[in-house]
Amino acid sequence: LSPSSRVATYPAPSGEAASDDYAVAVNGTPVDVYAAQGQYFDGDYAFAAFDFSGRAEIVVRSKAALDNVQIQPARYAGWLTRRSAHEIALRANAPFQISIERNGRVKPLLLFGNAVETDAPKPGDPNVVYFAPGVHRTGKIALTDNQTLYLAGGAVVKGCVAAKGTNITIRGHGILGGEESPRFKGPGRY
C-alpha cells in the first residue's frame, strides 16, 4: 500500500446494534459493522462504511463460511481474493458501494468505501442543520430553501426529512435511518 493511503473510520455510537456475523478492517484498521433489518430478502443484513484515499485493502471475516460468495455489482468481482473459508480480501483504489453475498442473499454485508471528505460544514454554519457523532432521535426534520442537512461520520439520525424548496442538500458520512418514523413503525418487524 502506498504511503499516501489514508483511512478514516467512525465508531458506532453506544447502543447501536453491532453485527456478530462480520468483522471488517481497512488497511489494518478495524471498522465497526452495524446489524440491520430490512423488509426484503429475509430482512437481516450488516453494513459498514469508511472513508479512504489512495489504495485500500479491505479484509472481511465472516462467522459463517463464505461459500459461493458473490460481490454485487458483479463488475467488482475481480477485487476479491479468498484467504480462507471465513475470510476474503478486496483491493480498491476508488470509492465504491458493494454487497458481499454469501450463499445467496443470506445476511449480506453492504460495504460503503467513501472518498475522504474535504469540505465538511461546521456546527453553527449558516443554513446548516448539523448532526455530530452520536444517536439523534429527531422525528421529522423540516428543510427549506438553501438548507443543508449534514450528518457527520458516526452520527446516527433516527427520523425522517421533509424537504420543501430549492437548493436543499443532504450530505455527510453519517446514517439517516427512518426505522423510528411513524410511517415505518408497525406492530411487526417492519
Regions found by a protein language model. Give the residues of each.
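Extracellular/periplasmic carbohydrate-active domains that bind, remodel
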Residues: L1-Y190
